């Protein structure tokens, strides 16, 4: 296939459709061709040298005035059943509005062409073409493009009938040592060249050819942050160089072999920036009869009419047949440029669908527009004394139905070059090819038909309104294309979403057209738009989700599922599969699914719905199969103990009795009881309703406690009791049995005063009623608010540890006045019946100790502390400030008496989950006073040590203020609390001097609460006005073992220090404490 005319250019003489433009120069090549000379890496400016211009005249455009309006008759493959198809003289007289050029998306002028195609949304969504195989069938002397870092790692193959012409190619090798040497390529088959070189090793690359420029537009990387990267920089490129080196032009057999090899390698998208040029003008293909043979002959005539012409050889050698085979059997999409002859018709390759109807699904023709986005690029060239020649993009012409437009001008940049400005439809086509790669990355299951439908129907309409003969479907819109098709104009759109049910794909455009949707495959497809396409929707496999309105009538096969999400609507529905009514969100708003036609649920299918959802049918409903009714979710509202009817299906007429459901299953949630289905008839039609009521929360919680961990049983039962008390109050309120409870509560209506205090309470209680029964233990436990009692008990125990530290200090003070500063760190775990709570604390104290008499020592300290407590889904933070004091009186060597005192204020801040899905926060203030009296007897131990037996009592008095949580109607409103606890203390103390400056200590003992501790808080839920209850609490171990080790050291000059470790715990509870301090003795 030889290009006419030829040009004296050194780089290439292809039929490739390009105009390569340097910074200040333009090169226009005839026959749709174009090129650049080799870049001079030592030159300034763009690095591009001389360019050539064509001097051969072009054929005049042929008028289409004779085409009749009935041109679409019997040619549905062209007109796709549309009456508004705009081609040739049927172009609309009204122009579309100017396109949105998105001029600010890519501010760098070298990326300006990306603005025209709205590429930014695709890039921001993370699509780069990764995993997509793209073929490039092209030409050009430069076979070193893969050596550029922008194209590094790509594959390049050459095809030629005369393989020996390739044996002279020399490539650079990139061994591990980083060196390089010239090697001669060896070729045993048609895969002539397949090499890789280091990204920085480009010294042997001397030319940038057409093949390099096209490859860069599709998949060039932006190196070192420079702009002008390609559309799909992570796509895998299979670069097919079809050049005949002896003639420096493309070979017909090489093109055909390239397509074959790409098909064998599984490549799905192929860029073809070349074509043949029409010399006989634009033949009127619509004037002939409809037989295939006459189409074939017309196509041959269109390609030139000369029996020796390369265009006829193309047909004789079945290149069109080869192309058609790969479209039909290899699912490949071929993208062609229209050419640069400023003609009204594109090159002949684009005409295949006239001769092979099915080929339309695998071919896209691309015209080029200027930077305005709505005009063709036109330029005049000519030598002095000759007639000027016009160059620029060919129109879509009679290929309009499979044609769109893309920028004619672009910019690329290779390493060691300045940006190269290029122009021509050779670069319009790869812009579309790169976008197709992004689309296939997002929707890897899309067929060639899916891809071309999506790319065409999402284009911005430019020129004459509708599909027109100049711009086809309009200007490529990559951002919109990434949201799926916008129309089904070519018949049914088959979405075979291969994969598993946990994978979901979304179409977010509004979809129109006369075609339908056939959903296959296991994955989910979501339709988010308001769709008006009129063909049928058939779900053969996987699930289809409707988020908006859908005009189409629908059919669900046995392996399919239709999900109406929220208040979606659709046409008539016939189902043998699954129909599922889902919630848009968790707001609890009642939503109606509207079927604008009839409903037929066959015996093999299942209707999944929930209370509060209404399936409204305008026509007749024939119901059968299985019904699965769930009371989960908030939409059913609050249920009282009496019960009420909740409608779930209404129709103009229900054609079969509701008992025709062969199987009914229900999920009542935690507290909802679904008793029976009732059918009622009214003036507006028939209705099916469920009669529902609530269960008893206390009994449900008691049953749930049997399966709860032992440590939660009491709290679960207490939470159920609290909730039942609340719901008895709600049942008695004025509107508790009203079907519009949730809506009325939300509105807080003044004409129903009984509901005003309960608005949020009804909603919170309803959420618990309709929660998952499996969450019962967690929910009931949260309604007991045990964190208040548990964190208070942990704080009281920690203050007791701090008071014991003061007591121990009295035993080892020595003479004189001593000032001491200490820090104490505590950590503990409380395990009870498989449930765990954790405590962490830190206290800083300063104090004094002194001899106040010959046998008397007194001490006082001020401490500030913070502790945290965590359990289940609740956390507490306690801040405190406390005063500690003690006095010891020695009775000679026999023993001693001690008096201890502490008084502290604390603030306990709580954050926790409550109910089904709510969160509450609160804070409570309190005081803790401790009084202790101890006596000790000294027992001689070894030669220098002392053993002391100590015992006594301590009284803890806790007073806590009333409080109310915020954030939830199921938060706790607690009464004030006063609790006194008597604690028995007994232990042993051993001291052993190591020298006159160091003493070791060891302690062991036991503590026992003589009357137990009960820090539970009476009160009620914040959303109640009368119902009462109390919080739960863990069982604080009555008996706790204590032990400790420590040392005191005199540093000299009055300075001294101490270190202590202590433990207090039981089988369920353990607290570890570490304390260090430094003091000065006056």
Curated annotation (Swiss-Prot):
Domain Autotransporter: 808-1082
Lipid-bearing positions (S-diacylglycerol cysteine): 28
Keywords attached to this entry: Autocatalytic cleavage, Cell outer membrane, Host cytoplasm, Hydrolase, Lipoprotein, Membrane, Palmitate, Protease, Secreted, Serine protease, Signal, Virulence
Active site per UniProt: 138 (charge relay system), 210 (charge relay system), 426 (charge relay system)
Leader peptide range in chain numbering: 1-27
UniProt keyword Repeat present: no
Listed PROSITE patterns: AUTOTRANSPORTER, PROKAR_LIPOPROTEIN, SUBTILASE, SUBTILASE_SER
Record lipid sites (N-palmitoyl cysteine): 28
InterPro entries cross-referenced by the UniProt entry: Autotransporte_beta, Autotransporte_beta_dom_sf, Autotrns_rpt, Peptidase_S8/S53_dom, Peptidase_S8/S53_dom_sf, Peptidase_S8_Ser-AS, Peptidase_S8_subtilisin-rel, Peptidases_S8_Autotransporter
GO cellular component: cell outer membrane; cell surface; extracellular region; host cell perinuclear region of cytoplasm; plasma membrane
This protein's domain notes: The signal peptide, cleaved at the inner membrane, guides the autotransporter protein to the periplasmic space. Insertion of the C-terminal translocator domain in the outer membrane forms a hydrophilic pore for the translocation of the passenger domain to the bacterial cell surface, with subsequent lipid-anchoring to the cell outer membrane and eventual release of the passenger domain.
UniProt miscellaneous comment: Probably a phase variable gene because of slipped-strand mispairing of a polycytidine tract in the coding sequence.
Biological role stated in the UniProt entry: Major human immunogenic protein, detected in patients recovering from meningitidis. Autotransporter with a secreted protease domain involved in processing other autotransporter proteins including App, IgA, LbpB and NHBA. Probably autoprocesses to release the about 70 kDa passenger domain. Both cell surface protein (Neisserial autotransporter lipoprotein NalP) and the passenger domain cleave human (host) complement factor C3, generating a shorter alpha chain and a longer beta chain than normal. Plays a role in extracellular-DNA (eDNA) mediated biofilm formation. In some strains (including cc32 strain MC58) eDNA stimulates biofilm formation. When NalP is not expressed (and no longer processes NHBA or IgA) biofilm formation increases.
Similarity comment: Belongs to the peptidase S8 family.
Protein name as annotated: Neisserial autotransporter lipoprotein NalP
Taxonomic placement: Bacteria, Pseudomonadati, Pseudomonadota, Betaproteobacteria, Neisseriales
